[in-house]
Amino acid sequence: MAKDLNVFDNEYGLLINGVWTKPGALLDSYNPANGEVLAKFTDATDADVDAAVAAAQEAFKTWRKTTTTERAAILNKIADVIDENLELFALQETLDNGKPIRETRAADIPLASDHFRYFASVIRGEEGTATQLDSEDLSIVLREPIGVVGQIIPWNFPFLMAAWKIAPALAAGCTIVIHPSSSTSLSLLSFAQKINHLLPKGVLNIITGRGSKSGEYMLHHKGFNKLAFTGSTEIGRHIGIAAAEMLIPATLELGGKSANIFFDDMPFDKALEGAQKGILFNQGQVCCAGSRIFVQEGIYDKFVNALAEEFKKIKVGLPWEDDTQMGSQVNAGQLETILKYVKIGEQEGCRIITGGKKIEGALGKGEFVEPTLIEAGSNNARVAQEEIFGPVATVIKFKTEEEVIKMANDSEYGLGGAVWSTDINRCLRVSNALETGRVWVNCYNRLPAGAPFGGYKTSGIGRETHKMMLAAYTQVKNIYISTREEREGFY
């Protein structure tokens, strides 16, 4: 039986102060797998942003005073809504983004639910400190919510990244104005429709539209006390500068060119799957994708040949079909970027082992590309240094542990990476030597709540998915008490 794909409203307004506005100027949201329009959404104006910020400021006056018990209860109710609507949200995310439904059903949506439950749990355990400095002086340290936060989320994981941003901010007592990518706004809008009744008006506000318009206006709005962004390093740098100019903090989770390192003694079959998961998950549109595959010389030919055969067997298909393993890129622009880099690799003398072409035929109306493996003669090749953001991995041979560490660290990025070996001492040595914020050992792309995620170098500032995020959405207050009854005698 054909799956019903009519799961969106025709038009979406903005969520401001608990009310859905009447749609104004509209933009189209497309299904990247077939080019069809899914729905229309609002292209917000400066006045819309002003109204959303004002609503968040007003709501903060009371939301900040709610107890951790009250906020935890709401977060758990939000998680319940996600669980109850898993199939709907999974299909909506798949249609809007192009990723296969087996991923949204098993990863994106359940992980989002878990993030709300995680922060509902850890907020109950947060405590201040009190220190008796001496016989007369007591220092009390408290953390208070930072205020109104402006959050901008990317198109590669719109639902999950919204959870990464919203859950800790609400838990900390902040109010929110959040802006999804104009390429993938629909799943967040649908989610907000389902949870709006759970939140006091103005606590969560959603602005949609062009990043160059409403997104840019948000960056310089003086009503924000913090900015948070997930996306490219180029835009992240721009946002960091905007935050610095306003003297407010920013959390930035940015790009990567992660090293997936395979030693001769790797667990072979598991490693084959790990190489695929590192670069084919979400069509390679993952900031921490294992796009540089380093293989030790003793196993190189066997592993690369086997990996190429696995790439050829991947079922690329319509993302809403249950047996599809890899879906569509998010839009035509991203597909063009991928194909451009394949050509750059060829011009640099790299060998295309498999893939590298747009898929035509029955999938010709969509933005589909073959899983691609490129043998790079050098780690200095552009395809080994620049973020492609697609299912394209470069393969590089290495001899020694020292050599691969040097090559892995020879990158402007430092977001993710992995080590594959049955020697735990080697795994720990290499993990400690890698200049990256997340190192997986004998696994890849595991992203649970409770494990801090973020980058070194130009891969960002701050962390996500851990209770330390509560510190990022709060500020420290010190209450200093003198119990001495007499004058100090200083004057």
What name fits each language-model region?
Residues 1-32:
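Hydrophobic face of amphipathic alpha-helices that form TPR/SEL1-like repeat modules
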Residues 54, 73-87, 101-126:
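Long amphipathic alpha-helix in the N-terminal Rossmann-like dinucleotide-binding domain
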Residues 234-378, 441, 488-490:
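ALDH superfamily catalytic-core signature
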Residues 128-270, 398:
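Rossmann-like NAD(P) dinucleotide-binding subdomain of oxidoreductase/dehydrogenase enzymes
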Residues 37-44, 58-65, 151, 260-263, ...:
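Short, well-ordered beta-strand elements within core beta-sheets of diverse protein domains
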Residues 32-97, 298, 310:
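N-terminal alpha-helical segment of soluble enzymes
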Residues 34-40, 261, 315, 347, ...:
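Conserved C-terminal structural/oligomerization subdomain of aldehyde/semialdehyde dehydrogenase
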Residues 35, 71, 93, 116, ...:
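Residue-level signal for inorganic ion chemistry
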